[in-house]
Amino acid sequence: MFNWVKTAMLMAAITALFIVIGGMIGGSRGMTIALLIALGMNFFSYWFSDKMVLRMYNAQEVDETTAPQFYRMVRELATRANLPMPRVYLIDESQPNAFATGRNPEHAAVAATTGILRVLSEREMRGVMAHELAHVKHRDILISTISATMAGAISALANFAMFFGGRDENGRPANPIAGIAVALLAPIAGALIQMAISRAREFEADRGGAQISGDPQALASALDKIHRYASGIPFQTAEEHPATAQMMIMNPLSGGGLQNLFSTHPATEERIARLMEMARTGRFD
């Protein structure tokens, strides 16, 4: 419950930040326009983001005839989770990774790279897909889509404010130094809020996935293996579209420095430690 309250507060914060920047650009009218833009972007993301992401990664839908073992695994786990059967996709990429997408459990899809199927055992793969189905069950896809959309919009609005200036409530030019400061700091604040949302949801999906599979140790082993393999194998599509990195079970980006500082994923070691504690105690709370 605490994680859901925290997520709601963070979502409110990122929306408020977007509206404040709109106000700096155009006063009260700018705030109204920013709110309308935010609603429009989120509406579009809600209905079409899954199709865009799957097309972006050239994901190919599979079924019981084209990928029987993988498909049956997802179906069994979906039944255990009391979820509708999602669409199942494969991505021809060497890096081991996986993600879920779709606006709700009735319109969900799960995708895995061919690399992850080669690297993981069947038991570990069950742990990974249970994690992705937990994202579906928790409706994390909607949350992550909105937060990513808002973070990107904040960055775009901040750049607009820096280059074109802003207006105060009376329509007069705003303080240019304040505008530059907001333009520089707002995208960082947006990224930090998005990071906090994503990290909280990853921990919840690890816990939920362990409950679905009944085998937290399998997911812990899978995360360890994915972490070791993924760091040495580039994922070109993810590098070209870094905003989608938060969807993956493991950060697919190869960059270091600030990119790691603002990673949308918790430390793998901490995730594994939590899962191993679940395995030791048999408790998932």
From Swiss-Prot:
Q: Which InterPro entries does its entry note? A: HtpX_protease, Pept_M48_protease_HtpX, Peptidase_M48
GO molecular function terms listed in the Swiss-Prot or TrEMBL record? metalloendopeptidase activity; zinc ion binding
Asked whether the keyword Secreted is assigned, the reply is no
The positions flagged as active site in the entry are 132
TM region positions = 7-27, 30-50, 146-166, 177-197
Which family does the record assign? Belongs to the peptidase M48B family.
UniProt entry tagged with the keyword Amino-acid biosynthesis:
no
Per UniProt, the cofactor note for this protein states: Binds 1 zinc ion per subunit.
Mode of membrane association: Multi-pass membrane protein
Q: Where in the cell is it found?
A: Cell inner membrane
Q: Provide the alphabetized UniProt keywords.
A: Cell inner membrane, Cell membrane, Hydrolase, Membrane, Metal-binding, Metalloprotease, Protease, Transmembrane, Transmembrane helix, Zinc
**What is the protein's name according to its record?**
Protease HtpX homolog
- Give any Gene Ontology cellular component: plasma membrane
Please list the GO biological process terms of this entry. proteolysis
Q: Where does Zn(2+) bind?
A: 131, 135, 202
Give the superkingdom in one word: Bacteria
What top-level class of enzyme does the UniProt entry assign?
A: hydrolase
What cofactor requirement does the entry state? Zn(2+)
Assigned EC number? 3.4.24.-
